[in-house]
Amino acid sequence: MLFRSEPGEFLLGQAYKNQYDGNFLGDIPPELGNNASYGAFRILQQDVASFETLLDTTSQRFGLDRELVAAKLMGRWRNGVPLTLSPDTPDYKLSEGQINAFDYADSPSNPTYYDDHTGLRCPIGSHIRRMNPRSGMVMGQPYSRRLIRRAMPYGPEYRHGHDDPTVERGLIGYFICGDLEMQYEFMVGTWGNLDYSQAGIRGTRDPIFGAQPEQQGRFVIRINDTRDPIVLSDLPRWVTTRGSVYCLLPGIGGLRYLA
């Protein structure tokens, strides 16, 4: 199952069921705004050494494979295979088109999906599940918050136990959408850093990029239906914004208008 996106999720002036009930350009002249996009350009420093160290300590403390801990925090294995399709191993053959074709619950149209409403396979608080609940409702409405991400790492690749952990490294790139406030800012602010009412993740933030309180971030991992959940209660902040600018990315017509 692939989730269909409306053109207006990424292109201004195109159809999109949002809070404006359709096409929306704001105060931008249509000659400039039609088929343009907004882009949040971000420089995100990542504390990779701290992340890898937490995997070590959590693995030793709870007897879990460190790569499974990493996958639970993210919602995917490092090779991109989602936990909801392969909860026990990253060695799961998927085509490029299948790697994002999944949901967290079954439905009449997709009865074969595993019903993971409790987060047994993919934790409810994991990064990819918080940032894209897929068929789940948003504030009671099926509004999408999808983004187009175009980014690249900066700094040297980190080799755990061999490299200087103080060397700065991270991610630099664009998060592209048709509505910065209701898509990008909503995802980062509400889904990423505000409290959810759902059981098991109350009082938590996104484990990967959330602005955690000082060494007090909390994350819940369910192993099975008989074992008590594992609670990580000392997550640090791993991602820090070093630079940010909101941009308008005109379409071809907009570039002609500016010329």
Predicted regions and their residues:
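Long, histidine/aromatic-enriched segments associated with O2/redox biology
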Residues: 1-259
